Each structure stands twice: as C-alpha cells, then as structure tokens.
From Swiss-Prot:
It comes from Staphylococcus xylosus. This is Fructose-1,6-bisphosphatase class 3. Its cofactor is Mn(2+). InterPro entries: FBPtase_class3 (IPR009164), Metallo-depent_PP-like (IPR029052). Gene3D superfamilies: 3.60.21.10. GO terms for biological process: gluconeogenesis. The gene is fbp.
Length: 650
C-alpha cells in the first residue's frame, strides 16, 4: 500500500512535468542545457561581514566587488589606457550617475562629449563581454539593462566578418546618442558590470549595530540579485524586538541612544519615542556622564541632555525586564545577572560574582529597593507603547521579514561553513551543551534548536513570554549562545562600576581554539562538510592586524573577515577590515583601508584596497558541478532523465 501511494505521487509529479516538456525534443533540449551549465566555471562568491549600519562603506565594497571590478578593468585596458584613465573609468562603473555629471560638465563642446559617449559605450561593452565570459547568454540577458536588452545584445555579439554590418553597428550607437539615451545606457551597463563580477553575496552577520543607516543596507540587499545572510547578534536583537521581546527592544534602544543613532528609530522606521522621552524628562538628570552618547559631535546641549536622560530610562527598563526571564528560565544559568537584586541601595554598592564594588553615576530613581525588578506603571506603559509602534512599522516589518527569509544562524555553502559568531565549546574543545525544553543540545543541533525557536517567535509576535521569545534574547546575551560567544555581558558594570576588571567579558574557548587545525576540521565534520577541503568563514570579532593578528588561521581552515565597516573598531584593528572572494580558481582575502568618501572616489577614482592574499588555490578549476547550485541542477537532470525514460523511451 505504501509503495503504490508513493508511486501515485511520483506519477502525478511526472504528469505535471510532462506538461512543461511535452515532446521528446523539448525534454532533450533542457537536459542538454542543464548538463552543459554544470561544466561552466563556478561564479564568484563575495563574503562581507559586520556592516554595523555603515551604508556608504558597504555600498562602495559592493559596487567595486572588493576590487573585482578594478581587476577586470586592468585585465582588459592596462596596455591601452593610462592609470588616470583607468581610475576615471573605474569611478564611472562604481558610481555612474554621479560620475557622468562630473564628466559631462568637463566638456566644452557637444561633439567632444559625443565622442566620449561612443568610446565609453564601446569600453563598457568590451568589459561586459569579458566579465560575462563564464555565463550563459540567458544569465547575461537577465543582468542587462531592461530597456536596452536588444541593443546591448547586438553590440555584445556583433560579427563583422564579412563587412556587411559595419554601418549598422555605428548607427546603433549614434542613434542612442542622438535620442539622448546614452546616460541611461551607460548607467545600466555599469550596474550590469557590478552584478556580473559577483555571482552571489554572503553577508556573514551584523547588518545592524551602532552605524547610522542599517535601513539603507537592508533596502540594498532586498534589491540585490543573489544574497544570503547569516544572522549576527545585533540582527537577532532587532528580530527579537519585532517578534515581541520587550527586553530585546530595550537593548536596541539603549544602543541607539549610546551611539546617538535614535534617528534610525524615529526617522527611518517611524517609531514614536515621545512616551519614552516624557518618562526620561520626569525622572532623570541630563548630566550623568556614564550615559552621555559616544558620538556627541554636532549635538546641541539640549539634545545631549535629552539623549542622556532617555539613555538612563531605557537602561533601567532593560535591567528590570531581564529579571523575570532569568527567573523563569533556570536552564539559561544567568542568576548572576539579576543585577538590580545585587545592589545594597543604602551603601550604594553591588556584589557581583562574590566581589563587592562601589557604584558611581547611578540612576535608580524608579527602582524600589524592596522590589527592584518591578516596572513602574509608567515604565510598563512606555514599553508597551514602544512595542506596539515597532510592530506597526511597515518598513521594519519588510526588513525583518527579509532577514528571516534570507537569513539563518549558519550556512554550509559550497563546502564551507559560514557562521557569524562561534560554535560553543569548552576548554578541551568539546561541544558545550544546553538544555532547551528538556532536550540536551550541543554543536549543530544546538544551533538548529536556536534557529527553530527564533522562527517560532517571529511567527507568534503576539506572545511575549514564551520560551521562543526568551531564547531570542538569550542568543543576544547567553553564555551558550553561538552569537554572543562570551560568559556574561557586563553592561551594568560598564555603566556603574569604575573598576575595569569588572567589565571583562570572557570569550568562549572557541576563539583561541579556532587557531587549531584539528579543531577546525572537527567542526567542519560535525556540520557535514569535508574537513580536508572546507573552510570556516567567521565574522563577529575584529582582527587586530595592528597587533600582528592574522585573519587566516589554522593553516587556512579558518578565515575571519570581521571589523570591516564599524569605524569604532578601526583604531584597534589598524585597517578597515576584510572581505573574501571565492571564484573558480580559489579564495582571496581583501584588506580594506579606511573609506574616505564617495566624493574622494569620484574625483580620484582610487580604491581604498590593499594587496589581496591568496587563501586557497584550487588544484583544478572549480565548476558549477562542484557547488550547491550544481547539486540542485543535477537533481533536476536526474528527474528529467527519469521522465524521458518513463514517457519517451519505453
């Protein structure tokens, strides 16, 4: 009975498929096409990490493909163009709209401009021909400017072998110029180049954090042709807030206040902060130095005071909201983080981890020493209103939905493991376990459980105190969280305790064990990957190149690409971070210098890149056959061959 049911489902599937391929010839053509695609070189993967809301730096790296665009331009034009001309042409491909205006303004006559148009269009066609050489015509067509597909294809595939079409091709370009379509075409062709040099983008976590424009990054990613995301700790914080976690919401508001990024909340996402400001004005002092925003440049004294008050108000709400979760979830092992219960309010000191510290810069105006974790009625009302406003933001809904659709905690892809934070291990390198809903989880299984509960929380935004919603917050701050990767988050200590030893956050042993080849191979094997061929691509921790730290660890098994975009880390890293390229020939690590500005690139055309380092070179050029996409295509071929045998051979 079971077999006949299986067969009937299979038969129905083959029936549906045969409607699409209703002749032997149509089926054979598709099989030939797919088999041929498997033999093409694999496309270039581009890995970026820890964008931290820095839209302009991210956009530049995206537009130049971590130097890939410039590399292609050099390959073709290094013998025919000067360095200055290559710089000008590169800037045009990166920022076509703005560069076009600068160039047009530099010409004194229309005839000179028209000559430039002809030269530039021909150069772009030449560049696209080279950049698309490993793609099918169908794939290339999808990348071409929509309104000019016919014209561009004629120019791309032109053949004047018998000298019959010379004037035809000349007229095509002349008519483009005469009908004032040149600008649109050049802009479209430039974006085509950008999309061709990178086949797929991996964002290895933390789109959000202290930078001012994560919303613009999200809009860019939504429009990007092929992308996946591995959630970072800050991304999960925003997902949690939208999914109904008040404590996640309090945390992200506190971070925005700390770095003077409240514009993200109010202007970008339309969330009303007025109730919180009213509460803050009523209870808090605007001169508390511990709560002054880190980025105070350009703020008036009144604005500084307002943010300082708001910062205190939301921090206290956060500490109060953490307590009930810690108490109802003993498996989280976070009793030491019941910080408001650790305070002697008469002596103004706190006892944490067995040591007593004097407190400074305190702001406990709304804390009842007899019931320190209880929200006042005003605080409860404020956080309820804020959550409602967050969940009613259409823009935030769209961005968080995209994060869920394209995002995962980790991703095995083309033989490599992509993960933002860590795989929690103990000092001996054994996977650390955590009990979730009565089930002991560790390693890959632990991460799978975390992700499952994030999705449950997101699907049930109206429930705010279930295990799923609590676990989203745990991912932000818990000691067995793959995203946090430390034993405790010492936020309270950083605000109120002068002794810096209390601020220390001990990292999971993963962060020093990842230097070990055998450890990395073990992790790859645990995630179902070939330990000899695979790599772990890791974000989350800035690489302190200034102190001699190497982003390539464990004989190339571990590659750390974090620190690239957050300006706050650049003084400690010595660079503006790393991105990674993986094409059919192997992997290259790209180190980026500080991104000055778009204006600097437009005027000078110079990239803020340093020399690429080869991480791993393929002994044989990798084909699509060897990739995740190739395995999917092979599965399609197998089904089509079965249909051929079932319907046309017998």
């Amino acid at each position: 009975m079971h077999n006949s049911t299986d067969k009937s489902v299979k038969e129905r599937f083959l029936d549906l498929l045969s409607e699409q391929f209703n002749t032997k010839e149509a089926l054979a053509t598709e099989i030939i096409n797919l088999e041929s695609i498997l033999e093409l070189p694999k496309g270039t993967e581009h890995f970026v990490s820890d964008l931290h809301g820095e839209f302009h730096s991210f956009q530049h790296v995206l537009r130049n493909g971590s130097g890939n665009v410039r590399s292609k331009i050099n390959d073709i034009f290094q013998d025919t163009l000067t360095r200055k001309e290559i710089n000008e042409f590169s800037a045009l491909v990166y920022y076509p709209e703005e560069k076009l205006q600068l160039i047009k303004n530099s010409f004194s006559s229309k005839s000179e401009l028209n000559e430039w148009y002809i030269t530039t269009i021909n150069r772009l066609i030449k560049l696209i021909t080279y950049a698309s050489s490993k793609y099918t015509r169908t794939k290339l067509r999808k990348s071409l400017p929509e309104n000019y597909v016919f014209i561009v294809e004629e120019l791309l595939y032109k053949s004047n072998k018998y000298n019959n079409k010379h004037s035809y091709y000349e007229t095509l370009i002349k008519q483009i110029i005469e009908l004032e379509q040149s600008d649109d075409l050049i802009i479209g062709l430039s974006f085509t180049v950008q999309h061709l040099v990178v086949n797929h983008l991996h964002v290895v976590g933390d789109i959000y954090d202290r930078g001012p424009e994560p919303d613009k990054i999200m809009e860019t990613l939504i429009d990007y042709p092929s992308v996946d995301i591995q959630w970072g700790n800050h991304d999960v914080l925003w997902i949690g807030a939208y999914a109904g976690s008040k404590v996640c919401l309090a945390n992200l508001l506190r971070i925005c206040a700390r770095y003077d990024n409240l514009d993200i909340i109010e202007d970008a996402y339309g969330i009303n902060l007025r109730p919180l400001l009213t509460l803050a004005d009523k209870y808090y002092d605007g001169s508390n130095p511990a709560f002054r925003p880190k980025n105070a440049e350009g703020l008036s004294e009144l604005e500084l005071e307002q943010i300082t008050k708001l910062h205190q108000a939301i921090a206290i709400i956060q500490f109060k909201l953490e307590a009930p979760i810690i108490k109802r979830r003993p498996a989280f092992e976070m009793e030491e983080r019941l910080v408001l219960e650790k305070i002697d309010y008469d002596k103004n000191e706190a006892t944490l981890y067995g040591k007593t510290y004097p407190l400074e810069h305190t702001c406990f105006q709304t804390v009842d020493p007899n019931d320190p974790n209880k929200l006042t009625d005003e605080e409860a009302d404020v956080i309820d209103k804020l959550l409602l406003s967050v969940q009613q933001s259409e823009k935030l809904k769209r961005h968080m939905t995209f994060l869920m659709q394209k995002g995962k905690l980790y991703l095995p892809y083309n033989g490599n493991l992509l993960i933002h934070g860590c795989i929690p291990v103990d000092e001996q390198g054994e996977m650390e376990s955590m009990v979730i809903d009565g089930v002991k989880c560790y390693g890959r299984d632990l991460l799978d459980h975390f992700e499952e509960y994030v999705r449950i929380a997101f699907d049930h935004k109206d429930i705010q105190d279930d295990l799923a919603t609590d676990l989203v917050w745990y991912l932000w701050t818990g000691k067995y969280s793959s995203l946090f990767g430390k034993r405790a988050m010492t936020t309270f200590e950083r605000y109120f305790i002068k002794d810096k030893t209390a601020h220390k956050e001990t990292k999971n042993p993963y962060y020093y064990l990842r230097e070990d080849v055998d450890m990395c191979k073990k992790m790859l094997k645990d995630f179902g990957l070939d330990p000899e061929q695979g790599h772990i691509i890791n974000g989350h921790t800035p690489v302190k190149e200034i102190d001699g730290e190497d982003p390539i660890k464990a004989d190339g098994k571990m590659i750390v690409i974090d620190g690239g975009f957050s300006k706050a880390y650049q003084s400690t890293t010595g660079i503006a971070g790393y991105t990674l390229l993986y094409n059919s020939f192997g992997m290259q690590l790209v180190a980026h210098q500080h991104f000055n500005s778009k204006k600097h690139v437009l005027l000078n055309g110079a990239d803020e890149l340093s020399i690429r380092r080869v991480v791993d070179k393929e002994l044989q050029r990798k084909k699509i056959r060897d990739t995740n996409t190739g395995h999917e295509i092979q599965a399609q071929i197998d089904i089509l061959k079965e249909l051929m045998h079932d319907r046309f051979v017998n």
